[in-house]
């Protein structure tokens, strides 16, 4: 892993088992290994590539005890999939155990367009690169406008209550 993690702790086995029971499957080995010491960790500023035109960063890894409730906020994810990280701008990274624990990107604006990021959680962690916001140099006039979906604030309020 190329980035530092802060504030994580070992997950309780009972919380891992409760999630596995709710999902009806075992959590992938690479994710379980991560949970042994980094449950709920916050990574240093980072970036990962979604596709040739887009990138994102992980804000926090979701504590295993909260995953099942957070899963209810995601539309169109497979039955044995579950969110493991909050990505920037209200998006998520999730794992799908029906696909051998592969990691996917879920975009709240395009929930039907799920993007595969890596074949496993461990491989996803290897995609995370340190990021320094000072490395971004915008040219005058480069940003013409920005837009936020009107329902986004309501989504965040609903999400934070769970």
Write out the residue ranges for each language-model feature.
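Compact, glycine/acidic-enriched structural inserts
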Residues: 109-137
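Intrinsically disordered, low-complexity regulatory segments enriched in Ser/Thr/Pro
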Residues: 101-109
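Non-membrane alpha-helical secondary structure
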Residues: 56, 113, 117, 144-148
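Aromatic side chains
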Residues: 31-34, 105, 121-124
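Short acidic-glycine loop/turn motifs at beta-strand connectors
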Residues: 96-99
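Glycine-rich, aromatic-bearing surface loops/beta-hairpins
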Residues: 124, 137, 143-153
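A surface-exposed partner-binding patch
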Residues: 1-94, 142, 150-162
């Amino acid at each position: 892993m190329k980035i530092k993690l802060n504030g994580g702790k070992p997950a309780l086995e009972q919380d891992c088992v409760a999630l596995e029971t709710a999902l009806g499957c075992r959590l992938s080995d690479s994710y379980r290994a991560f949970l042994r010491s980094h449950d709920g960790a916050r990574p240093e500023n980072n970036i990962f590539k979604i596709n040739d035109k887009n990138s994102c960063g992980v804000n926090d890894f979701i504590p295993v005890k909260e995953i099942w409730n957070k899963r209810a906020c995601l539309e169109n994810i497979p039955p044995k999939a579950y969110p493991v990280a909050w990505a920037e701008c209200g998006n998520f990274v999730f794992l799908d155990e029906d696909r051998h624990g592969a990691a996917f990107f879920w975009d709240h604006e395009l929930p039907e367009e799920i993007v595969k990021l890596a074949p496993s959680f461990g491989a996803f962690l290897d995609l995370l690169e340190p990021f320094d916001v000072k490395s971004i140099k915008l040219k005058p006039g480069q940003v013409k406008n920005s837009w936020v979906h009107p329902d986004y604030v309501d989504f965040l309020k609903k999400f934070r209550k769970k």
